[in-house]
Amino acid sequence: MTAPSQVLKIRRPDDWHVHLRDGDMLKTVVPYTSEIYGRAIVMPNLASPITTVDAAIAYRQRILDAVPAGHDFTPLMTCYLTDSLDADELERGFHEGVFTAAKLYPANATTNSSHGVTSVDAIMPVLERMEKLGMPLLVHGEVTHADVDIFDREARFIDTVMEPLRQRLTTLKVVFEHITTKDAAQYVRDGNDYLAATITPQHLMFNRNDMLVGGIRPHLYCLPILKRNIHQQALRELVASGFTRAFLGTDSAPHSRHRKETSCGCAGCFNAPSALCSYAAVFEEMNALAHFEAFCSLNGPQFYGLPVNTGWVELVRDEQQVPENIALADDSLVPFLAGETVRWSVKK
């Protein structure tokens, strides 16, 4: 029997889906991402969404100003799609290297998505332009109709939105973000080279029982919501198979403690401090460490047409305890796995 690995050395990873917020929150959370990842796809759903080139440039600078000295980190900016977005502005941002991708939020699907798209038809000229440019479309894949159960939103989205869109725009590059269901895993697996997916650590590690049985755990509440065990297992099997169009996207989404631990709490897991170690634990449990580097560091650049990072990151088998909380101005953040012990650590 082979002894378990004590060190995992991988090309420096990227985070293909992260929320860095703004203001004091931005300054607090950026170092947890910039310390480990070479690049990150930054979500545009600020209180005033990022819909113009100038807004993206200004936000990128605020992010860079929050990166500690010695961290080599490149934020990759995204444009928030709205029904009224100017396709020429989007194209200008893409050609100038400001926008790496554009994000489709169905209206009211998640945090700060009230400005989102009411129907795909409303933005079809923009999507057609993106297809011609080879610009990736990042999709929060849930319908938001009042008559659709929250646990069925993703599966319904595939049938009613995603598949018709991909049939219409056959060469549009699409990232089905933070997939959570067996349906989505199978859909992406069966898709062509224009379709990829990101998967979060929480959806690989937990299911809805973990969030709801024995008391509600608000720090596991995120959108798309955790699903039943069969869906969690499908995601684990997808990444363990070495499937090359699935890659790391933490969806790290910080909210202050008082906005999570309340009668109507916000959705999102702040997992940046422990995400890479969490992924490593999952791959180890699935006897799939041979595919860990590709998931973290190779598959994403391949899909986006970007070079692989030149640096390296080492994880060591050294247990560490995740902090119970992290100071935030006049409040605090409770990180994913707060107070728990993880068996891998990133070597400093």
UniProtKB/Swiss-Prot annotation:
Cofactor(s) needed for function: Zn(2+)
Reaction catalysis annotation: (S)-dihydroorotate + H2O = N-carbamoyl-L-aspartate + H(+)
Any one GO CC term of the record: cytosol
InterPro entries, A to Z: Amidohydro-rel (IPR006680), DHOdimr (IPR004721), Dihydroorotase_CS (IPR002195), Metal_Hydrolase (IPR032466)
Role of this protein: Catalyzes the reversible cyclization of carbamoyl aspartate to dihydroorotate.
NCBIfam families: pyrC_dimer
Subunit and interaction comment: Homodimer.
Protein name per the record: Dihydroorotase
